[in-house]
Amino acid sequence: MTAPASPHDEDALGKAFDARLARRLFTYVRPYGRIVLAAVVVLMVEGALQLAPPLLTRRVIDVAIPAGDAALVRTTALLLVLALVTQIAAAYAETLLTGILGQRIMHDLRRQLFAHLQRLPVPFFDRNPVGRLVTRVTSDVESLNELFTSGVVAGLGDLFTLLAITVLMVMVDWRMAIAAYLVVPGILYTSRWFRLRVRTEYREIRARIARINAFLQERIAGMRVVQLFSRESDEAARFAALDRAHLDAHLRSVTVYALYFPIIEILTSVALASLIVAAAPRVEAGTLTVGTVAAFIQLARRFYQPLQDLSDKYNTLQQAMASSERIFTLLDTPVADGTATVTAVAPRHAATQGVTVEFEEVWFRYGDEGGRGKDESGPEAVWVLRGVSFIVRPGETLALVGHTGAGKTTIISLLLRFYEPQRGRILLDGRDIRSMPVEELRRVVGYVQQDIFLFAGDVAGNIRLGAPLTDEEVRQAAARVGADRVIQRLPAGYGHVLGERGASVSVGERQLLSFARAIAADPALLLLDEATSAVDSEVEAEIQRGLSILMQGRTTIAVAHRLSTITGATEILVLHHGEVRERGTHRALLARSGLYARLFRLQAGELESTATAGV
């Protein structure tokens, strides 16, 4: 029922406002103001030192050489070497400071993104491919690194150098300075054209990268299916098409980029040649010295370089803007209600007390605040749950049965507040769960999913999941559900490192570990979503023995595929198209000879499959 996000959602971003994004990016720089200040000072020193070679050159040509003063030549050369060494030291300090600045900002931004991701509602992850989100936290953040390391601070240094050279050029010869400035409008116009063209291309590049990452993540995760159905050639062709689109976007940006610098170089070269031609008559007339011309040519080259560098910095800014749009779009996604940090932790229910769970006329459909795609076939067709009501008291077990899509797992998801109902209420000990902080709600719940997820780490860590449990408490939890026997057979026991998603253990062993994980926190409410569907009969019997002890005093809601596992439930709800069609104990429902009885006898082999038509 999930409506996947369009792969073209990446292109649906609105027009960016550079000033707005730049101001927001600056908030990440503010905590490191001292580093920025130090880097700017170093850059100013470096810029000032660039003025020394032209002036020293003029001194040698106009004074030392005509006078034949070898000592002055040596002194000037020594000063030039000293200026260059100092400039190199300043460049080293600038690189070090901006590198530290960039890495610290990247560290802060990645941490913020990951913390925000963990607080987003489950429907958000239904809509967004994993690969796209990974791109946000990795590639997009990394693209901002150059902005902070060689963009912002270096841009300030370029501005200072440009201002200093502008003033010095006027002081050296104001007529030649005016001639040098005439090419500036052409440089600015070319830079504006480049800026407008390259921004579109960089946004396209970032979108293409996100699509490639999403495609790779999905295909790698489903590689067994790809190989099983011999889809390698088809998937390779699809990947080639995605990669070709990325290549084309890159080539367009390279084409624009390749045009820009030659045009700037032509403009500056023509300007320098014009300066030399214009200076020749004045030198011949004796109103301008050769040393002044040589110094001015050096100053002019240094004047044009910051202009070119500033445009290059703007290129860096364009890449950063394309990435920051996506990063801030993610950060602006509203978090799930009730996920704010709880400063005062409410005492959790004692497991032996259980809790009372009550559904009051609950209606739910995906798409309305549930965050999934809407079904346009009509208002009644989209309801996954229709007026579901029940109550489960401490120590009782409620079993949910029905065909696929009947709404069983949705009830579990609503209880965990992965989604919110559109109508009705869900109460926990008489308290609407929407008024409870999510952390408080989930502290009382032990949840075993049908699709078990184990993290790449040791067995004990997967059972503990960060909870302050001793090794002995972890072992006790495993022993109570029969997982200890399985764990002891692993090469390193509780220290055995599991592969990604628990790939180094079987499906049945993963389910046993998930039972231990759920029980380790001693929950008051157990939610079991077809928890024994992937284990064999022997393991299932062992788990059932453990569960019968663990359920004592606890409230349990179990989604069951094997009806034989819930015959002892306090009450069984039979769901059909989101409605409660039958309810009662196992014996009462069998006696009624309705849907439940037909399902049960079918599983027991008493009916042919045709007998279930219409169920």
Predicted regions and their residues:
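Membrane-integrated ABC transporters
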Residues: 1-50, 65, 69-79, 94-98, ...
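Juxtamembrane helix-loop junctions of ABC transporter transmembrane domains
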Residues: 10-18, 41-42, 49-62, 83-130, ...
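An intracellular "coupling" helix at the cytosolic face of ABC transporter transmembrane type-1 domains
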Residues: 26, 34, 122-123, 139-148, ...
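Transmembrane helix-loop-helix hairpins at lipid-water interfaces of multipass membrane proteins
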Residues: 30, 36-90, 170-175, 273, ...
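Transmembrane helices of ABC transporter permease
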Residues: 35-45, 150-204, 275-288, 305
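Helix-loop-helix
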Residues: 66-75, 168-182, 252-325, 330-331
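Helix-loop junctions and hydrophobic alpha-helical segments within the transmembrane domains
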Residues: 113, 117, 226, 327, ...
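ABC-type nucleotide-binding domain
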Residues: 348-615
